[in-house]
Regions:
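PLP-dependent class I/II
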Residues: 8, 12, 17-28, 32, ...
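Conserved N-terminal alpha-helix of the aminotransferase class I/II PLP-enzyme fold
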Residues: 88-121
Length: 421
């Protein structure tokens, strides 16, 4: 067989395969076809594929603490296993864990909740999705400040709602103002999603900024705020502030939190909402049909995490703050990058738009996705373009990694972008 014949057969097989893939995709539900794949997971997968090929890639694309779950928490889980604590759990979570969450909210946040106002889920991601599905009807609007976590708009679309983006860019430290919020509200607005400390930017809303937003919300009936506080304990500027603290706002707020970031328990999959009882009942009804209650052993581990010493949380926070200072210093030394100092979480979100239109002779950078891919392919550092987060001028780096990895990654980035002219 001639080479041309082999090429023809190979091309025909590829065409048939693609046709089959697209035909199968067309049979998926319309609601599923509205969704986009996770850009953060896609970049992490690309990084893993390169590593499997023997390429030394530093992965700064994943939002996950690099620390291990503290030993005492693991021992609590082992004891639960030894005690045969392995049956189906109640849909809203075990009462003892919900009591521990109520105590946490009282002691740390000065917020008064009852056990019936707490619903424990399979991670904070499910908590967010439960809330959106329970409150947002077809065609209703959800205001999302941009930059935003990649899953927020997808969850709104899944519920049949309409994401309404409010641009809160680099020059305003990635925080939506009260005036912007007021201007975005329409008769169709049902919810605002607020993440503080923020993924992807690390920005933290002050008490005064939250009060101004709360005043706007309270002027509008039947308007709720989903307050994603999963990075609460990774805060470098002082006490965490919750929008639910202001008079009248507890009835309008759905707090989302969990153990994944604060206690390095991402794989344990425990999150929760604290909300008015009628909202909790609605989310409980939904969760009862989707997943039922969360893992019994994970709940025992989470309960112990909340009621035991919090020194492990502070130790990790201090380590993240040190790494924050290191990556900010090194990023500021790279010509072309503009840097805001993150006040919480473990992300840096520098502006990279000065490189757009530049080329190394082989690759031209047109946007933040190009820039992130360039860093991966040429510098072997995995990041995520800001396009995925609703900000085309920036890109996200996670500094939830060792000091050595941060230093080497920033060295590679500096050397790689220096080739762009």
């Amino acid at each position: 067989m001639r080479k041309s014949d082999v090429f023809l057969v190979d091309s025909q097989l590829k065409c048939l395969l693609l046709h089959k893939i697209f035909r199968n995709m067309a049979q998926l539900s319309n609601r599923l076809q509205r969704l986009a794949p996770s850009a953060t997971l896609a970049m992490s997968q690309k990084s893993s594929e390169m590593k499997a090929q023997g390429i030394d890639v530093i992965n700064m694309s994943v939002g996950e603490p690099d620390f291990n779950t503290p030993d005492a928490i693991k021992e609590a889980a082992k004891k639960a296993i030894d005690d045969n604590f392995s049956k189906y759990s109640p849909v809203p979570g075990y009462p003892d864990l919900r009591k521990a969450i109520v105590a946490k909210l009282k002691n740390e946040n000065q917020l008064d909740y009852t056990v019936n106002e707490i619903l424990v889920s399979n991670g904070a991601k499910q908590s967010v999705c439960n809330t959106v599905m329970a409150l947002v009807d077809e065609g209703e609007e959800v205001i999302i400040p941009a930059p935003y976590w990649v899953s927020y708009p997808q969850m709104v679309l899944l519920a049949g709602g309409k994401p309404v983006f409010v641009e809160a860019g680099f020059d305003q430290n990635f925080k939506m103002t009260a005036a912007q919020l007021e201007a975005a509200i329409t008769p169709k607005t049902r919810m605002i999603i607020l993440c503080s400390p923020s993924n992807p930017t690390g920005s933290v809303y002050s008490k005064e900024e939250l009060k101004a937003l709360a005043d706007v919300i309270l002027r509008h009936d039947d308007l709720f705020v989903l307050a994603d506080e999963i990075y609460e304990h990774i805060n470098y500027i002082g006490k965490h502030e919750s929008i639910a603290q202001f008079p009248g706002m507890k009835e309008r707020s759905i707090i989302v939190n969990g153990v994944s970031k604060a206690y390095a328990m991402t794989g344990w999959r425990i999150g929760y909402i604290a909300a008015p009882e009628w909202i909790v009942k609605g989310c409980n009804k939904l969760q009862g049909q989707y997943t039922s209650g969360p893992c019994s052993v994970s709940q025992k581990a989470a309960e112990f995490a909340y009621i035991s010493s919090q020194q492990c949380v502070e130790d990790m926070r201090q380590a993240f703050e040190r790494r924050r200072d290191l990556i900010v210093k090194l990023a500021k030394e790279i010509p072309g990058l503009e840097v805001n100092v993150p006040e919480g979480a473990f992300y840096l979100f520098p502006k990279c738009s000065s490189f757009y239109g530049k080329s190394d002779g082989e690759t031209t950078i047109n946007n933040s996705t190009d820039f992130a891919m360039y860093l991966l392919e040429k510098g072997h550092v995995a990041t995520v373009g800001g396009d995925a987060f609703g900000d085309p001028e920036c890109f996200r780096m996670s500094y939830a990694t060792s000091d050595e990895n941060i230093k080497e990654a920033m060295k590679r980035i500096a050397e790689t972008v220096a080739k762009l002219k």
